[in-house]
Structure formats: structure tokens, C-alpha cells
């Protein structure tokens, strides 16, 4: 059975952080991504934070409260390194504030780094992403993973 909340999804997005060894937590930015019907990752948008916030289209005060909440809780962990917290927005504007926590380097952080390096809308091929025949391509402002299998 699929939770009704997920059936009404209109947007996948994430908050990207890094937890430092001294337990300080830095908010790196937002990422917006697409998934298929099965929920599998499709691609990230490589855009400015302003462009991503327009896509997210949620009250800024709510987003700031979520950032503070996640920073407070991440600071209490023994982990240090990159973290992405996946969220979703529903048709009525509700936010699911924590679908998944990725305690690792993730595609959202890579999209932030690519935007910093190349800007919005750049086309960049990155190969190989993995030893297993995958490629990454940034095209029309979207970060996509392509399988050669």
C-alpha cells in the first residue's frame, strides 16, 4: 500500500550539509532532483540556489526552521562528512521533512559543486563515475547518470 502522502508528490528536493569533526554543521544548499515512478533517481538540476528555491516554492521561514532542526540533530551524531536529507513536497504544499538521510557524498552535493564550477545550464560530461560502466552528464542544467549496460 502506498501512503497517500507520497501519491500527491509534486517535487523531490534535499538539503545538503557537511558535519565537521568538531560537530559543527554547515548547510551547503538545496538540491532538486527528479525520480521515476518507482522512486529511482533520475537527475539533479544544476542551478543557482535562487533558481532551486523558485522550484521548491515553499515558505522561506519553514525552510530555515528545517535547516536549524536538521543542523541541531546532525551535530549530535558521531558522524562527520557530507549528508543529504531527501524531502518531498505534495500537491497541497505540505513538506515531508525527512524521507531519507544519505550519510555520504551524493548527487545533490555533486550538483552544487558543478554549479559552482560551471554555472547554470552548462553541458559537461563526466566519465567514468564508477567502474561499472556508468557515465554522468550535465546537460541543459540537469545532472544525469547514464548506464552503458
In which residue ranges do the predicted regions lie?
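Phosphate-binding site of ATP-dependent enzymes
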Residues: 1-39, 88-97
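Sterically constrained small-residue positions within well-ordered secondary structures
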Residues: 6-8, 76-78, 136
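Conserved metal-phosphate-binding beta-hairpin within the catalytic cores
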Residues: 74-107
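ATP-dependent carboxylate/phosphate-activation module, predominantly the ATP-grasp catalytic core
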Residues: 17-71, 78, 102-129
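Peripheral (often C-terminal) accessory segments that flank ATP-dependent C-N-forming ligase machineries
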Residues: 120-149
Amino acid at each position: 500500500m502506498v501512503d497517500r502522502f507520497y501519491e500527491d508528490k509534486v517535487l523531490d528536493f534535499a538539503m545538503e550539509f557537511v558535519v565537521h569533526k568538531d560537530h559543527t554543521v554547515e548547510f551547503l544548499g538545496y538540491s532538486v532532483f527528479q525520480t521515476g515512478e518507482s522512486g529511482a533517481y533520475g537527475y539533479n538540476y544544476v542551478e543557482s540556489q535562487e533558481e532551486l528555491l523558485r522550484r521548491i516554492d515553499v515558505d522561506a521561514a519553514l525552510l530555515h526552521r528545517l535547516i536549524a532542526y536538521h543542523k541541531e540533530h546532525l551535530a549530535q551524531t558521531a558522524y562527520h562528512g557530507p549528508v543529504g536529507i531527501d524531502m518531498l513536497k505534495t500537491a497541497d504544499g505540505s513538506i515531508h521533512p525527512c524521507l531519507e538521510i544519505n550519510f555520504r557524498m551524493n548527487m545533490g552535493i555533486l550538483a552544487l559543486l558543478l554549479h559552482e564550477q560551471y554555472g547554470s545550464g552548462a553541458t559537461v560530461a563526466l566519465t567514468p563515475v564508477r567502474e561499472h560502466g556508468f557515465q554522468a552528464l550535465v546537460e541543459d542544467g540537469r545532472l544525469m547518470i547514464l548506464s552503458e549496460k
